[in-house]
Amino acid sequence: IRDRCNIYKHDGRKERGVDTIERKGFNYRLTELQAAVGVAQIKRKDIFVSKKKNNLKMFNSLLEGVDEVVLFKFNPRGDIVPHRNIIFVPDAHDLISYLVDNGVGARTLFMPMHSQPCYDINNDFPITEKIYSSGVCLPSAPSLTQNDIEYICELIKKYFK
């Protein structure tokens, strides 16, 4: 497996410096600049994690009383770092359009695998489709301010009035 991964990592070549491409591959090697940025970000990891957790708490607190919004609940025994701030609403696509029209970078959850063109699976997965049609990813960057989060939550409340 390691050898196969190395082939993929090196543009499909078995060895560096050899121009024979054994199979389709990719260039997964980091540039020095990317590595330097990664090292700098690792040093600030605790700050990023703290901000993302606080942002999620603020979103949940501000949206808790909105009947149409179901908050994504994490296992309380786990210590998660929210990659995304997810809510569920009756019609995600309409809310997302409204938020985007008002300057908020909201998006859908990932399209279900069975709906991806490369898989072409014509089966019915109603739970997956329901989650996709109702899930909204709100901004989650550590750089969000309290004002940003309050603005987003006020827009959501206004949308459902």
Residue ranges, per PLM feature:
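PLP-dependent aminotransferase class I/II
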Residues: 1-161
